[in-house]
Amino acid sequence: MSIDGLPPLRDVIERHGLQAKKALGQNFLLDLNLTGKIARSAGDLTNTAVIEVGPGPGGLTRALLSNGARRVVAIERDERCLAALAEVSAHYPGRLEVVSGDALKTDFAALASAAGGASGQVRIVANLPYNIGTELLVRWLTVVDWPPFYASMTLMFQREVAQRIVAEPGSDAYGRLGVLAGWRTKARIAFDVPPQAFTPPPKVTSSVVHLEPRATPLPADVKKLGRVTEAAFGQRRKMLRQSVKSLGGEALLERAGIDPTRRAETLSVEEFVRLTNSV
């Protein structure tokens, strides 16, 4: 038995005949010491509801529950994993709800409300499937209601994506993702995870990112900000007067008080907000 009284994860995947599917962006994390570290990176989980995406055979799920989460709602698209997750649920009666479905079609705000946590009580903790991780993060960063339905997000990404999330202006990694994350959250990389921690091992290093919502982000229309960053970074090597030409070009930049010869990667989050509010 493992430290939580359940079978080792390698035994679980062997008994259930589970193999990670590349089409689903799966890489199973089998080291319970590592899943425990991820759970602890999310903060004190005592009496907290947690939403998890892509639990697979339940390694992180087990860590969340053993670290005190009052309730975990786990969304799993792969029906092959449901039997293994049912065993975890039986070990923690009444504390794990497994939702069989597609995370991209999930109403997370409704899910959080049903989990019994008002805003500030629900945390998102997940080893996100690589093929949908960025899309999910953007959705969570751009929810209309703010403060959002989550108190924090602790998420695993490929390190290259993680670096884009926490990137500062002027760096090669800085782009739309960094602007959105910096606008609405305080984001940091908690730690890196080597490929050999996974089954099968991916070709790249992964990173766990912790994001906490800002109570009062600078006011801006989220859809407009999306259009501005898309235009600006769509031609990131060009001067802003060219890259945002479709939004008003030099006249827009003049209203925002921004030098039209600058490039998108040099603008701070505050300047992007100013630009957005000038559209």
UniProtKB/Swiss-Prot annotation:
InterPro entries reported in the protein's UniProt record: KsgA/Erm (IPR001737), rRNA_Ade_diMease-like_C (IPR023165), rRNA_Ade_Mease_Trfase_CS (IPR020596), rRNA_Ade_methylase_Trfase_N (IPR020598), rRNA_adenine_dimethylase (IPR011530), SAM-dependent_MTases_sf (IPR029063)
A GO MF term: 16S rRNA (adenine(1518)-N(6)/adenine(1519)-N(6))-dimethyltransferase activity
SMART domains: rADc
SUPFAM superfamilies found in the cross-reference section: S-adenosyl-L-methionine-dependent methyltransferases
Bilayer-crossing regions: none
EC number: 2.1.1.182
Catalytic activity reported: adenosine(1518)/adenosine(1519) in 16S rRNA + 4 S-adenosyl-L-methionine = N(6)-dimethyladenosine(1518)/N(6)-dimethyladenosine(1519) in 16S rRNA + 4 S-adenosyl-L-homocysteine + 4 H(+)
Pfam families with a match to the protein in the record: RrnaAD
Location, primary (coarse class): cytoplasm
Enzyme class, broadest EC rank: transferase
GO cellular component: a single term: cytosol
Disulfide bond sites: none
Residues that hold S-adenosyl-L-methionine according to the record: N27, L29, G54, E76, D102, N127
Keywords on record: Cytoplasm, Methyltransferase, RNA-binding, rRNA processing, S-adenosyl-L-methionine, Transferase
UniProt cross-references to CDD domains, sorted A to Z: AdoMet_MTases
Localization terms from the record: Cytoplasm
Similarity field: Belongs to the class I-like SAM-binding methyltransferase superfamily. rRNA adenine N(6)-methyltransferase family. RsmA subfamily.
Function description: Specifically dimethylates two adjacent adenosines (A1518 and A1519) in the loop of a conserved hairpin near the 3'-end of 16S rRNA in the 30S particle. May play a critical role in biogenesis of 30S subunits.
Entry-linked NCBIfam families: ksgA
Protein name: Ribosomal RNA small subunit methyltransferase A
Species, as recorded: Mesorhizobium japonicum (strain LMG 29417 / CECT 9101 / MAFF 303099) (Mesorhizobium loti (strain MAFF 303099))
